[in-house]
Amino acid sequence: MREIVLDTETTGLDPLTGHRLVEVGAIELFNHLPTGKSYHTFINPDRDVPREAEAVHGLSSEFLKDKPRFEKIADEFLAFIGDSMLVIHNASFDVGFLNAELGFIKKPPLLYERVTDTLMLAKKRHPMGPNSLDALCKRYGIDNSKRAKHGALLDSELLADVYLELIGGRQIALTLP
């Protein structure tokens, strides 16, 4: 079974107030094993990146100004995810932004039925929390020392490890070339 673990970075917290995507990162799992295939892009949001958002992910308006707009990367992104199940931490946030961007270019939305929300899984498994990505990495002994700032691709890689722990643990001896 093919699954895509993905994360986004944005200019703010709500696409309904004009905030936009600035980065998408995704990695492919097949039968719960990383295949080594990934998708990553930065996106020009056509607006300024507020200082608060830049402090989270480190992506400035200046850095993003020559990056492609979402409509230029949408087909490639949709081809990468295909009809696979999506694994996302706090899925309503990321799917909300992705669906807003897809709506701007008249593409159909991603359906929540194809999404596994690892935040919901974590809350069921660890109801006393905390259940942030950093907290889950610490709980499961996953090295997140490279994560000085949020980054969509690195966060997807960390989330894949967390997801595998949440569903029953990693099989250390099994890896794909």
Across the structure, where does each feature detected by a protein language model lie?
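Short, glycine/charged-rich beta-strand-loop motifs at protein surfaces that mediate ligand recognition
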Residues: R147-A152, A173
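Glycine-rich phosphate-binding loop plus the immediately following alpha-helix
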Residues: G129
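Acidic, divalent-metal-coordinating active-site segment for phosphoryl/phosphodiester hydrolysis
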Residues: G151-L166
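Acidic two-metal-ion nuclease catalytic site recognized across multiple nuclease folds
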Residues: E165-P177
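Conserved non-catalytic scaffold segment of RNase H-like nuclease domains
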Residues: M1-E113, K123-H126, A135-K149
